[in-house]
From Swiss-Prot:
Record-stated family: Belongs to the tRNA pseudouridine synthase TruA family.
Organism ancestry: Bacteria, Bacillati, Bacillota, Bacilli, Bacillales
Keywords: Isomerase, tRNA processing
Function per UniProt: Formation of pseudouridine at positions 38, 39 and 40 in the anticodon stem and loop of transfer RNAs.
Gene name for this UniProt entry: truA1
NCBIfam families per record: hisT_truA
Top-level EC class: isomerase
GO terms of molecular function: RNA binding; tRNA pseudouridine(38-40) synthase activity
Entry annotated with the keyword Glycoprotein: no
UniProt-listed Gene3D superfamilies: Pseudouridine synthase I, catalytic domain, C-terminal subdomain, Pseudouridine synthase I, catalytic domain, N-terminal subdomain
Protein name: tRNA pseudouridine synthase A 1
Residues annotated to bind substrate: Y111
Enzyme Commission code(s) on record: 5.4.99.12
Length: 247
């Protein structure tokens, strides 16, 4: 058996998230459907670095699967991309040992969130950025960002629906990139809780709008209560950008 690692990019707009759900179109469902065709009807389960929600995009999602087929890496890439819909692309394939695991071997993840700061919607970017129609004080946002960096209990910044009991995570970097009419938030951490990036972005936008003081972030973290953080930003501005492994 070969263990195959794939890096996957997808446009999340027309998916109900990554993970299989009955009666809904998902990324995992489409990948496993393509693999089933390649394996003459045999079901092949894939493991991913993590789930993404409905409408969330990925540039660098990572999956693995085990297979009895002996194909070269480029053959896997060509075969899968031929069978996958045009909103999913396999961008890289590597053969790995059994020690590699797409989920449990993750060392760090990078997410990016795009905000279009404009009163006027952009019809061509509407599925890929969060249009924010209010003026923002970028310096206030920059002042708030360092409070999130480091190891914290992020209970205040995750969905109440999370199934994770341990809410402690480490954020290594948060970078705010000003690019034309967009603000791009770049997050690197050892892992992220359910909706965590989107809630942090929503909170930082509140800071930029003057609804929250930048220095209030430590207090919100300490309260460990979701109701004190900002509104969650929508899914379509979020991208799983890159996943790094310890092996």
């Amino acid at each position: 058996m070969d263990r195959i690692k794939c890096t996957v990019a997808y446009d999340g707009m027309h998916f109900c998230g990554y993970q299989i759900q009955p009666q809904h179109r998902t990324v995992q469902q489409e990948i496993e459907k393509a693999l089933q065709k390649l394996h003459k009807g045999e079901l092949v389960r894939v493991q991913a670095s993590g789930r993404t929600d409905s409408t969330v995009h990925a540039k660098g999602q990572v999956i693995h699967f085990d297979t009895p087929l002996s194909l070269e890496e480029w053959q896997w890439s060509n075969a899968l991309n031929t069978m996958l819909p045009d909103d999913i692309v396999i961008t890289q394939v590597e053969k790995k040992t059994e020690e590699f695991h797409a989920r449990y071997g993750v060392e760090r993840k990078e997410y990016r969130y795009r905000v279009l700061v404009s009163k006027t919607a952009d019809v061509f970017r509407r599925n890929y950025v969060y249009q924010y129609p209010y003026p923002l004080e970028v310096n206030s946002i920059r002042k708030a960002i360092p409070y999130f960096i480091g190891t914290h209990d992020f209970t205040s910044f995750c969905s109440a629906k999370t199934d994770k009991k341990d809410k402690v995570r480490t954020i290594y970097e948060i970078e705010l990139i000003e690019q034309d009419d967009e603000l791009i938030f770049r997050f690197v951490g050892n892992g992220f809780l359910y909706n965590m990036v989107r809630i942090i972005v929503g909170t930082l936008l509140n800071v930029g709008q003057g609804k929250l003081d930048p220095d209030s972030i430590p207090e919100i973290l300490a309260k460990q209560n979701r109701q004190f953080a900002g509104k969650m930003a929508p899914g379509h501005g979020l991208y799983l950008w890159q996943v790094n492994y310890n092996n």
